[in-house]
A protein has these predicted regions:
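Beta-sheet entry/capping signal
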Residues: 122-123, 172, 181, 273, ...
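Bacterial Sec-dependent N-terminal signal peptides
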Residues: 1-31
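Catalytic core of carbohydrate-active enzymes
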Residues: 515-517, 524-525, 532-543, 556-560, ...
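N-terminal accessory segment at the very beginning of proteins
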Residues: 21-332, 340, 350, 357, ...
């Protein structure tokens, strides 16, 4: 990674605000109409800008197999307009350099790249666009769980003529000399993907630019664009919490942390620069700069990774989904086990405003025998709604410490909302500005009207954690880490970096600051966060944001959670019923079982969220049954959660992870595995049944009715009390507990093992509080 990009003479530039032409010939002009504040950035525009200079990877000049360092020559080109039969397009053409003095700036620069094996399944490939390369240890990447430990013992490195080969038991990399190209193969030698070169172009009109970088005419900064091939039938997954179809081929994704105001658009609270393919490879773009991934959208055979970074730092993985997720999370980190109580019911709305409201909600939950562990106070616990000052309103909360203590005795933990932005009317606003704790722009002033905490400043982190620490010491169990998507991109941060590198990574620093102080005070690994980037998965947990209270909002929520799980996140939640408006009872009934069959479950949104406030009194009974299901399954959930922390696999799991050899599993994105043994197919409309894909070669057992279903597509009725299709793998042994009103009252000494399907010798798994490892039980 290179820092201080776009910072020239103290001025921050936005290179996208220029006239550009797309590959299809469509003109896009941003002149005089720059991106709106915090708007998602499309970095592909840089690579169709007539004012930029283009450099294309051409030939291998040298390579040292002993240390993995090489030199590539890059050919200088420019974009030239072209008219043909009343159509205006453009083509890349060779460009003679006019740089002065010409002795200092070569026509075709020769720049370094490196290849380093991390382990038998992982390679790190770095390609530089400048003669000045960053030192390996000159910064601590918050995206990684420490510096990688390199082990090349299982790799054989050889040279044949101008070509270089890296071969391990799991895959290989071929570096061709001319044209310079990277080719990935599996252990059998089958090609997985390769970087595209000019000779790959086979269309008369669409000339796909190969691996390149640009030097921006506005500020001489650089961006790089590795272009990889996409094969027929290839499917690509990951890139973060996207509500679009799980298979990203045919899509363009802007990896730029933003507030999409719900999981219904391609924009994301949690973009993640990681993906994998059904062909057996994955890639992690180790950058915090904006990235645009054109995954076969503009050209079906090309996966273009437009990185607003001056180097490509790419980790390449070989394996199936479980193996690739394991390798990626071993690098970027896995979470410690969240506390048991966090897996229980969180009851919330926007917002409880008084101590009396909080106590009454707790009373109603216990009176109605709805198992629950958390009461969440959202934006209304301060004197002024939404103005975070870390203090309970003295008028509406007479004795918050006693309230917290009393509720804890009843089995309730308290969660509190806050955010890292301070409006001018906030009492802390002057202090943050005076002490330099807020982010500044190139002029040394605030880039926004609000003061935004600068988490690259150790003094800011100390100030912030002192405020949260007092609340946690009072007995608060969790802090809601809301927002974090609007870190100023036009800013200069305390560590010297600009917003082009700090915007996307702001959520990781934000998540970490809260997680660290929570662990320090409470000894527990728990937050409740909305925004994320690679590395945030170390700090559970994250929820899906402000879903619409609609059928499509529910469906988008499922896809978002599955996509985030395929991007390395073990734990995830959502606002049961949606957030934006009051949830219709019929929709709430369908959403509840799906919401409770998630690692973490919170009823939250526009009131009412409390079931006893609905006109239909039977709805409280239904809500209770959904909560009771989760508490009965708590031994299974807790055990599966522990396994996820050890493997990096998601609890909310796409079918393709468990069934990679079943082609049908790769196309399903509206049902999910809940852990390794259970499958959930929500009802997204007011219907009684739905088509469900049953993967694998064994039968599935209906959890509610006991009916048996053969593999394949089946129309299955939600045959039980809960409006959801819930299935268990044939042969599974699921541990259950007697339903308790809170997780601290579960009797872990009396586990009931329920056997599903075919009789025979079986094994079960169990992880209980106080245990250090999962125990396997034979039956």
């Amino acid at each position: 990674m290179t820092i201080n990009r776009f910072l020239v003479g103290g001025i921050t530039f936005c290179a996208a605000c220029m006239v550009s032409v797309t590959m299809s010939g469509e003109t896009k002009s941003n002149a005089g109409s720059a991106y709106l504040l915090s708007q998602t950035k499309d970095m592909s525009r840089d690579f169709s800008d007539l004012s930029n200079t283009y450099f294309f990877a051409d030939s291998l000049v040298s390579f040292n197999t002993a240390d993995g360092t090489g030199i590539v020559e890059w050919k200088r080109q420019q974009l030239m307009p072209r008219q043909a039969f009343n159509a205006n397009t453009y083509l890349h053409q060779p460009l003679k350099s006019l740089d002065f003095p010409d002795t200092a700036y070569p026509q075709n620069p020769r720049l370094s790249f490196t290849v380093v094996p991390v382990n038998a399944r992982t390679l790190r490939i770095r390609v530089y666009t400048s003669p000045v390369t960053p030192k390996e240890n000159d910064y601590e990447s918050v995206m990684l769980a420490g510096q990688p430990v390199y082990d090349s013992s299982e790799w054989k490195i050889s040279r044949e003529g101008d070509d270089i080969y890296y071969i391990s038991p799991y895959g290989s990399l071929e570096i061709t000399g001319y044209p310079w190209r990277l080719v990935l193969r599996d252990a059998s030698g089958k090609e997985l993907t390769r970087t595209r070169v000019w000779s790959d172009n086979d269309s008369t009109q669409v000339k796909v630019a190969p691996f390149s970088f640009i030097k921006r005419g506005s500020d001489n900064s650089r961006s790089i664009n590795p272009v990889w091939s996409i094969s027929p039938g290839e499917r690509i997954y990951g890139f973060g919490e996207s509500a679009t179809p799980l298979d990203k081929v045919g899509q363009q994704l802007n990896l730029f942390v933003t507030d999409p105001q719900g999981p219904e658009t391609p924009d994301m609270y949690k973009p993640i620069p990681f993906f994998f393919s059904n062909r057996g490879y994955g890639m992690f773009m180790h950058t915090s700069a904006p990235v645009t991934a054109d995954v076969g959208r503009s050209y079906i055979g090309a996966n273009k990774l437009f990185m607003a970074d001056e180097e490509m730092d790419l980790f390449v993985f070989f394996g199936n989904p479980k193996e690739i997720l394991g390798e990626y999370t071993a690098l970027s980190g896995r979470p410690e086990m969240p506390p048991l109580w966090s897996f229980g019911t969180w009851m919330s709305r926007i917002s409880y405003f008084t101590e009396d409201e909080g106590r009454e909600v707790a009373r109603q939950l216990r009176a109605n025998k709805i198992p629950s562990d958390v009461i969440h106070f959202d934006t209304g616990w301060f004197d002024v709604d939404w103005q975070c000052d870390y203090e309970f309103s003295p008028e509406r909360f007479k004795n918050p410490a006693k309230m917290i203590s009393d509720l804890k005795k009843e089995g309730f933990h308290i969660s509190l909302w806050q955010l890292p932005y301070f409006v001018p009317g906030n009492k802390y606003f002057p202090e943050l500005v005076e002490k330099g704790l807020a982010v500044k722009n190139g002029k040394g002033t605030l880039p926004y009207e609000d003061a935004v905490l600068d988490f690259t400043n150790p003094a800011t982190v100390e100030w912030y954690q002192e405020k949260l620490g007092k609340l946690l010491s009072m007995g608060v169990g969790a802090i809601k880490v809301d927002f974090g998507e609007a870190a100023p991109i036009e800013a200069v941060y305390d560590n010297g970096s600009t917003g082009w590198y700090e915007h996307n990574i702001y959520p990781v620093r934000y998540n970490k600051a809260v997680a660290d102080v929570t662990r320090k005070v409470n000894g527990e690994n728990i937050i409740w966060a909305r925004s994320a980037w690679s590395g945030s998965q170390r700090y559970p947990l994250h929820w899906g944001g402000d879903a619409a209270s609609t059928d499509t909002g529910m469906e988008g929520t499922v896809r978002s959670g599955l996509s985030l799980g395929l991007s390395g996140f073990c734990f995830w939640s959502n606002d049961i019923g949606g957030f934006v408006t009051s949830t219709p009872e019929e929709l709430y009934r369908r959403w509840l079982p799906m919401g409770f069959l998630t690692s973490h479950s919170r009823a939250h949104g526009a009131p009412p969220t409390e079931p006893w406030l609905y006109d239909n009194k039977e709805f409280t009974d239904y809500f209770r049954k959904c909560a009771q299901l989760k508490y009965a399954l708590m031994p299974y959930i807790y055990t599966e959660a522990k396994e996820c922390t050890e493997t990096g696999l998601p609890m909310y799991r796409a079918l393709l992870v468990e069934f990679p050899d079943d082609p049908g599993a790769w196309s399903v994105d509206d049902q999910y595995m809940f852990g390794s043994q259970m499958m959930v197919a929500p009802l997204f409309e007011n219907v009684e049944s739905r088509n469900v894909y049953l993967p694998g070669d064994a039968d599935w057992i209906d959890y509610q009715s006991g009916k048996r279903y053969a593999p394949g597509w089946r129309d299955i009725k939600a045959d039980g009390d809960l409006r959801c299709v819930i299935l268990v793998r044939d042969g599974a042994v699921i541990p259950h507990a007697a339903v308790a009103q809170s997780t601290d009252r579960i009797d872990w000494d009396n586990i009931e093992w329920k056997h599903y399907g075919t009789p025979g010798v079986k094994k079960g798994k169990i992880f209980k509080p106080g245990m250090t490892e999962i125990s396997v039980v034979d039956f």
